[in-house]
Amino acid sequence: MPAKLGYWKLRGLAQPVRLFLEYLGEEYEEHLYGRDDREKWMSEKFNMGLDLPNLPYYIDDKCKLTQSVAIMRYIADKHGMLGTTPEERARISMIEGAAMDLRIGFGRVCYNPKFEEVKEEYVKELPKTLKMWSDFLGDRHYLTGSSVSHVDFMLYETLDSIRYLAPHCLDEFPKLKEFKSRIEALPKIKAYMESKRFIKWPLNGWAASFGAGDAPPS
């Protein structure tokens, strides 16, 4: 029986989970809640056996999880992809935290009612953060070495989202551009992105000042 992944019908926090599942070839069913489905979700939220009800949720047989990082860690652990030593596991946790910091920083700008005002400062400071990631990646193909892990999809998704706000943000960082292209070229990811199941837009919830709406900026 396939696992179930529930989230809003947008990219948001579920997109790295989707990408990771697709990369692994895991069979799963998506339960998507549209813009007008808030009442539907609220009617189901506390009746699904979730310990801490929220979106995204992931139900795999008896395992019922919420929180996107916890979901990805569970899936990674099932596939033996969480490291083999305390040092490796701690390093992966560190990357998760930094990737979430990047995502949260992007989200704060996108959901700010004064978006146009805060955007300028965000774009101005962005190169410092991107340089940190570029330096960390170095000559490796992926964040933990030569193999793909869930943290790669966490970073990829935020980088891809940021480019809608700052289209040329990666021009100074060829290693990050190559990393992004490398993820998109993975056969199963490429096939997913070309499928009807792939959600390109919106990036954020419908209350966002940026990344919502019916179509991406031209």
Curated annotation (Swiss-Prot):
Q: What is its EC number?
A: 2.5.1.18
Q: What's the domain of life for this entry?
A: Eukaryota
Give the location in the cell.
Cytoplasm
Q: What class of enzyme is it?
A: transferase
Q: Name one GO biological process term.
A: glutathione metabolic process
Q: Where does glutathione bind?
A: 7-8, 41-45, 54-55, 67-68
Cited CDD domains: GST_C_Mu, GST_N_Mu
Which keywords, in A-to-Z order, does the entry hold?
Cytoplasm, Transferase
Q: What is the documented function of this protein?
A: Conjugation of reduced glutathione to a wide number of exogenous and endogenous hydrophobic electrophiles.
Subunit text? Homodimer.
Q: What is this protein called?
A: Glutathione S-transferase class-mu 26 kDa isozyme 47
Q: To which species is this protein native?
A: Fasciola hepatica
